[in-house]
Amino acid sequence: HQTNLYRLSINLRKAWMEARDLLPDILREHFPMPPILVKALCNKMNLYKKISHCWNKLIILDSSKNAREAVELHQRWPSRVKVVLLTRDGRGVYLSRRSSGRSQSESVSGWLKYYQRALPLLERYIAPDSLIKIRYEDLASEPERMGHLLCNFVGICFEPQMLDLSSISRHLVNGNDTRFSPGKGIHLDERWRTKLLGAELEFFQRTGGSMNSLLGYR
């Protein structure tokens, strides 16, 4: 059960970190992370080490989407942490959420706020050779080419069997329903091109069009 004091401490740390993100670099170093968050980062790296040892793997892929955490991990272990930013055309995201019954504003706000926070942080604090941007559309339509690109990014050789997720043991926590369909794979979904029309498309363009352009979509 969360007490009021516990919730207050979380909100204060969140406000501190958000304010810290806005500071110039010369000031940011004088506003350190709260010790409890530093401990959490160290715990995560220790977990990576344990997984690497137990599974005998050199590379651990963490599909977490916390951009601030990615920045802090990279800054503390720059030679060991690389970041992949996977994007999707916001029009596809918007249509998917609208189809699930969300309002217009709900369907664009989460996607928009995430990239409004993530893009400046990643581009400002992640070394260029440690950050790669991958489009879902490219991954779904050209998986082998993108596989080569990702492998080059982390310094390993691409092997075609990497694309067959059903050929290996996986341990998934949370996620969507594809975790129960190992043979389903990734398929390009661009229904928005034919189904997102009129007022709906106009709303997205008005609210999320600029961000979509920043992500490289036209």
PLM segments and residue spans:
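Conserved phosphate-donor/acceptor-positioning beta-strand/loop module used by diverse small-molecule
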Residues: 62-66, 72-98
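PAPS-dependent sulfation machinery
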Residues: 1-60, 207
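Phosphate-binding beta-loop-alpha motif at adenosine-nucleotide cofactor sites
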Residues: 58-61, 125-154, 191-195
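Short alpha-helical
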Residues: 68, 92, 141, 145
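Lumenal/extracellular "mature" regions of secretory-pathway glycan-modifying transferases
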Residues: 99-114
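Short, hinge-like loop/turn segments at secondary-structure boundaries
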Residues: 79, 100-104, 150-152
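Short hydrophobic/aromatic-enriched beta-strand-loop microsegments
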Residues: 80-88, 104-108, 159-160
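PAPS-dependent sulfotransferases, especially Golgi type II membrane carbohydrate sulfotransferases
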Residues: 23-32, 36-39, 98, 119, ...
